[in-house]
Amino acid sequence: MASVQLSSRDISVFSNEYKERRRLQMMRFFGATAFTLISARLAFRGVQSRKYVPNMFQLNHKPPTYSFQGEAVSALAFGTGLATGTFSMLVFGTCWVWDISSLAEFTLKMKKLMGEPVTDQALLENTPMDEDTRKVAEALEDMLKGSRKD
C-alpha cells in the first residue's frame, strides 16, 4: 500500500508554482460552470420546444403525439447534465476556495477541520514511549533478531 507524501513547506503566494496551481483550480471551476450553463440552456430549449401553441383553427385541447421513450431519454440526459454540472461546480469551487488540488490534501484539510491532529512519521518516531510499550517493542525486536540469526 503506497502512502502519499505531502511536503509541509509553505508555497509562496508569489511563486510560479502557486500561481499555476491556482490557475488550474480556477480553470476547473470555470469549465464546470460552462458545462452547467450549456446544460441549462439545452434543457430550457428542450422544454420550450415541447410547448404546444396551436395555429388558427387548430384545437387547443389536443396536444400533438409524442414518444414517451424519447421524452424519458431527453429528460434523463438533461437532468444528468444539470446534476453533474452543479455537483462539479460545488466540488471545484470548494477546492478553489480552500486551495485543495488533490484528494490527499482534501483528506488532510478535513482531518484538521474535524480536530484530528495531523500526524507525521518523524513526530511518531520521536514520541516517548511508556514503560509497557517499550518492553513489548524490545521483546519484539529481540524475537526478530533471534529469528534472523537462525
Swiss-Prot record:
The chain crosses the membrane at residues 29-48, 76-98. GO terms for cellular component: membrane; mitochondrion. Keywords: Membrane, Transmembrane, Transmembrane helix. Coiled coil: none annotated. Its main location: membrane. Disulfide bonds: none annotated. It is found in: Membrane. InterPro entries: AIM11. It is a multi-pass membrane protein. The keyword Signal does not apply. PANTHER family: ALTERED INHERITANCE OF MITOCHONDRIA PROTEIN 11 (PTHR39136:SF1). Belongs to the AIM11 family. This is Altered inheritance of mitochondria protein 11. It comes from Lachancea thermotolerans (strain ATCC 56472 / CBS 6340 / NRRL Y-8284). The gene is AIM11.
